[in-house]
Amino acid sequence: MAYMFFNKYKIPEVVIKNGKKYIYDKVRKKDILFTPEEKVRQQVLTYLIDELKVPEYMIDEETAMSYYKVVSSKRPDILILKKDEKTGEAVPMAVIECKRNNTLIDGVIIEQTLHYAEQLGCNYAMITDGDYVDVAYCELDNKMLVSIKSLPTYEDMLNGIYEEIL
C-alpha cells in the first residue's frame, strides 16, 4: 500500500439544498449527497480524468454488476471501461473502491474489490481511502495478482502496461 493524497484534486462546489449538502457528479450528471466517501470518489474521478486521461464516457459509477451480465446486485464505486474487441460494447477493465478518509483497508475490503475484479473480468483493481492506495494488476487467466505502483494512464491500461512494485 502506498501514500497517494487525493486531496490535491479539486472537487465540484458543495451546495446546500433542503438543509443537506450535495455535490455535482460530472460523470453521472447529477447532484449527489455529499458524504466523506463521496468526497474521496470525486477526488478520484478528477484524478482519473485529469491525470490518467480516462474519457468521462468510459467511467461508470455505482452501477449494479448485473448490468455487465454478472449475477450480483453489488455496485462497485467506479469502473473504468474499454471497448470489447469482439462486440464493440463497453466492458469493465478496472474496478475502484473508494472509502472515507482514515478507513482501515483490511482483508475484507481487499477481498471484496478483488472479487469484483474477477467477476467483472477486470485487469486492474484499486482501493483508496483518499490517503492510501493499493493497486493490483489481475492476471485473470492464471489467477495471479501483481502489486503495481499506481493505476496506469488509460492508454497504458488498454495496452496492459503497468509498473510492478519490486
Model-found features: residue ranges?
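A short, conserved, highly charged catalytic patch centered on acidic carboxylates
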Residues: 1-124, 131-166
